[in-house]
Amino acid sequence: DTDPGQILAVFANLASDSPKNGFTIGITDDVTGLSLPSLPYSGDASGVFSCKFWGLGGDGTVGANKNTVHIVSDLSGMYGQAYFEYDAKKSFGVTKSHLRFGKAPVDSSYYVKKADFIACHNQTYIGQYDIVSELKEGGIFLLNCSRTGEELEAWLPDGVKRTLAPPPAAGSGPPAPPRVPPPR
């Protein structure tokens, strides 16, 4: 997936006093040293709500998200866009659904890098992938799991809890622990 930050790096290279004649983007090429580091990019246009869903191949996440884009677009009058990423295994491999919604046409030809909403439909992914770092500040994270609130508090990795914890108010001391909803 080539994203805008990588394209910005190409233009910055071309505008530099000594541009690299041959280069790579999207990878860190530690053998040739020809990689251009990706430049910061603020993300989607304003008014675009971006979502990322992590699923397991065959669990229905991708199919449900294909339907979601159609339903939201048809019933709300909003524009929708969806890209789907599949593991080579297909069944039982990792799937990622990248959805965007906006009041104007959504024209982002790359995967969601920072999302307003992230859902993880396979609880084992929390320990395997850095999912919550892709959440925008103030975003919503939904973990589909079978644990109670107390079990979840004990089970979640500390790094995940720190990322999801609300930022402390100025001068209020250490951050508060994350809020875990009570079991239903």
Range-by-range predicted roles:
Residues 1, 45-57, 61-184:
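Active-site cofactor/cluster-binding pocket
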Residues 1-44, 170-171, 179, 184:
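Peripheral docking tails and interdomain loops at the edges
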